[in-house]
Curated annotation (Swiss-Prot):
Family affiliation: Belongs to the ATPase B chain family.
Protein name: ATP synthase subunit b
One cellular component (GO) term of this entry: plasma membrane
Organism listed in the record: Mesomycoplasma hyopneumoniae (strain J / ATCC 25934 / NCTC 10110)
Keyword entries, A-Z: ATP synthesis, Cell membrane, CF(0), Hydrogen ion transport, Ion transport, Membrane, Transmembrane, Transmembrane helix, Transport
Its membrane topology: Single-pass membrane protein
Gene encoding the protein: atpF
Amino acid sequence: MVNLNQSLGDLFKGIIPNVYVLGATIVSFLILFLFITYFVYRPLKKYIKKRKDFLQNHIDLTIKSNVEAEKLEKKSQQKLLETKEFCIELKEKSQIEANEFLEDAKKTAIDNARQLINEGQKVLLEYENEIKSKYYMNVINVAVEICQKYLEKQDKNNKILQQSLIADLEKELKKRENSSKKKDNFGK
């Protein structure tokens, strides 16, 4: 039995560690664990949290910026549509006003021509016996030329007025398009 106890003791003698070595190993493990925890794990955990918060803030800001950009784009599209409608309406009104002005000018020219013709006829009636054959055609020709010149002048003035109105309208459209483009570029 002593042999058996001794052989078992020899067997377990190599398996059971030395208490001092085991204590030193546990203490060194605890020191290493505390060192890694305080000097590596916690700073690394704080850095990862800061980095995660930083990225999340940027993601949130990007989403918010995209939403605001979409809102601004919708507003600018709405304003562009309103501007186009306004320009179409303004163009139609200017064309109507120009046509009315042209008609009024024609009526005035015709009235003036009629008045000139009537005056010419009165003069012709007074001097009918003396200059009937000689000046009858001259008075009518003068009246027609005056009417033509007056109509040409009125037509030219109307064209100039219409061109200036259209040019002003185009400038206004370009200004509004440029301002909307600038807003679009700024929003992007």
